[in-house]
Structure formats: structure tokens, C-alpha cells
């Protein structure tokens, strides 16, 4: 019985690892008014972009390149 429980636990851990490796994490990255989609297999990449000062939001897969209003850049001139 103990071996069965251990085997089931190992199978669950393996299934989670495989699912994690195959998952695509898509998010929108915006910087200076330009937004684009990034899809990677790493969850922590979102945090890395956020730490660098980018505006990062989760988006659906069908979202494509967009450009925000130019009003943000007008302030710099």
C-alpha cells in the first residue's frame, strides 16, 4: 500500500512538471507607448519585466501587436 501511495505521488509530481514545461505564458509588455506580445514558457519572466519598469499585463493568445496613444511621448518634448 505504501508503494502505491508513493508511486501515485511521483506520478502527480511528474504530471505537474510536464504540464508546467508545456504551458505558454502570454503577456503584454508596454514601454514608451509601444505594446507587444510575449509568449514564453517561464512564469518568472513576467516578474522580470515588471522589475525593469515595463507595464506588463496578461493577455489572451489572439491579441497581436498594438500601439498606445502617442500622448505619453509628447510630454518628453
From Swiss-Prot:
Location, primary (coarse class): secreted
Highest taxon, organism lineage: Eukaryota
Tissues of expression: Hemocytes.
Cellular component aspect of the GO annotation: extracellular region
Keywords (A to Z) from UniProt: Amidation, Antibiotic, Antimicrobial, Cleavage on pair of basic residues, Disulfide bond, Secreted, Signal
Presence of the UniProt keyword Acyltransferase in the record: no
Signal peptide (from-to): 1-23
Entry's Gene Ontology BP terms: defense response to bacterium
Subcellular location: Secreted
Residue list for modification Arginine amide: 40
Cited function: Significantly inhibits the growth of Gram-negative and Gram-positive bacteria.
The name this protein goes by in its record: Tachyplesin-2
Amino acid at each position: 500500500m505504501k508503494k502505491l501511495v508513493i508511486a501515485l505521488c511521483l506520478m502527480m509530481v511528474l504530471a505537474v512538471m510536464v504540464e508546467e514545461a508545456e504551458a505558454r505564458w502570454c503577456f503584454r509588455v508596454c514601454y514608451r507607448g509601444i505594446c507587444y506580445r510575449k509568449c514564453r514558457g517561464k512564469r518568472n519572466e513576467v516578474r522580470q519585466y515588471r522589475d525593469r519598469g515595463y507595464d506588463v499585463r496578461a493577455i489572451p493568445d489572439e491579441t497581436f501587436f498594438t500601439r498606445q496613444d502617442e500622448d505619453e511621448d509628447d510630454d518628453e518634448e
